[in-house]
Each structure stands twice: as structure tokens, then as C-alpha cells.
Amino acid sequence: VPSSLREACPPDYAHAQPGGSQTMKMIGRTVLITGGTSGIGLELAKQLTTRGNRVIVTGRRADRLEAARQAVPGLHTFESDVRDPASIEALYQTVSDRFPSLDTLVNNAGVMRNIKLDQSYRLDDLTAEIDGNLKGSIWMVQAFLPLLLRRQGSLIVNVSSGLAFVPFPAAPIYSASKAAMHAYTQCLRAQLDGKAVSIVELAPPATETPLFRDEFAEQMQGESAMNVSVLVKHAIAGIEAGKPEIRPGLSNVLKIASRVAPSFMLRQMVKLGRPKTSGA
């Protein structure tokens, strides 16, 4: 992305929207984070715990949940899979019984894959990102919303991506899932306008996480990404400022550029998705 375009945009930009969040302190809350054993989810758990919140994270692997507990003293963990409605229902029963004061849900679980659409895939495997990134978040909201609506000042944070605004052709299903998450979150915010629950969308840019670097190592060679600790600080500051959309760094550029130069931005993303070669 041209440096002139980066410099022309403020670091974080969001218009007030119907149902936008109220200013709130992220202190003394009970927070449930899906996909909290690594990357953004784990860093969010660390920072929120340090600020005096009671934090619960979910994940699919017992060994990673144990590692998260070791990394974050006082962390509560549950094995759960957002792709499985029965698993979500069981999680709801457990959390609502043990943590009836739950007032914050962070839909962070997800996967990002490099997919070539001219290759052969099993149909259910091809849409795995839709199941985890989109359907899982919708199901989590549907399951936990009745509990959250009982507490004034509750919060739902849906984690989308800067790619919700300009797709990354190397990750087509991921891009589609995050664009849909953006639309769903806007609708959820509008429908819950005036209710007890505020709706926030966090759209991270490329972020230094194992998921991102492992899957796109060739394409991202030499490219910069936001430090995950810095991203989470942006997220918490945005929530406390009452921003309905939090778009740190390049995500803000993508949102604005998608409106003023959509074709140009898509071409840039096509170039970015090509594997780097020596001497290039």
C-alpha cells in the first residue's frame, strides 16, 4: 500500500453508528474469549487479566489450554469448538452456571488459509473458514445473548479483519467470511440499538501471530505486520472510547481506500498475494 495513502489516513477511524457502544472501562468485567490459546485471543486474555478482569478462554486442544493457563495466572479455560452447535450449547450451560456475571463476549476464534480455487477440495473442507469464522460467531451470539441482555453495559466484540473491506485473493474464503462478519455485526448493532448490549467490531490488520506467519510465510516475506500487543492495546482503548468499529493501522487505510479506489486496492492485494522470489 503506498506510503502516501497510509499517511493520509488517521490511525483509527470510525463514524458513530446506530447501536454504537457506550464508553466503558475494561476493568472488573467477566470476559469470555473464543480461540484464546494463541495470537490475538491469548494476548487479549493477558492484558485483560492484568487490568483486573475475570477472563475465560476456549479452545479445541487441551494441551494449548493448559499452556494458556500457565501463561496467564488466574485464567479460566474450557475445551470447546465453535464449529459444533452442541459444543456451544454445552459451553453456555457451564459458563452461565459458573459465571452468571458474564458481561463480555469476544468472538475471536477463526482460521485463515491459503486456498487456490482451481485446485480440488472436499466441499466441507473448502468452507471450513465459513464454519469457524462466521457461523461459529453467529451461534455464540445466539447462545449467549439472553445472558448478556440481563446485564446493562454488556459487550459483544466480533473480530473481523481489514480484509473485510478489501479482499486478499490468496485467502478467498477467509476474506469472504470476514466481509460477512462485518455485515452481520452491523446488522446486530442496528437491531440491538438501545438494548443492554453494545456491539463492537475489531478489524485487525496483518498481525504478528503464528497463524498468519505460518500460512502465508512466502507471500509475507519482507512485509511488516502489527505487533499483537500493540493491536490489543488499540482494541482496549477503542472499546473504552466507545468506538463501534476499531480499525488499527492498515485496516483503517483499507476501509477508506475501498471506497475511494477499490480497483486499485484489489490490484495491490493481488500483488501482495504472490509468493516472493529471490531478487524480486
Regions from the language model: what does each represent?
Residues 89, 112-127, 170:
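Conserved mid-core segment of classical short-chain dehydrogenase/reductases
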Residues 80-91, 123:
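The beta1-alpha1 cofactor-binding region of Rossmann-like NAD(H)/NADP(H)-dependent oxidoreductases
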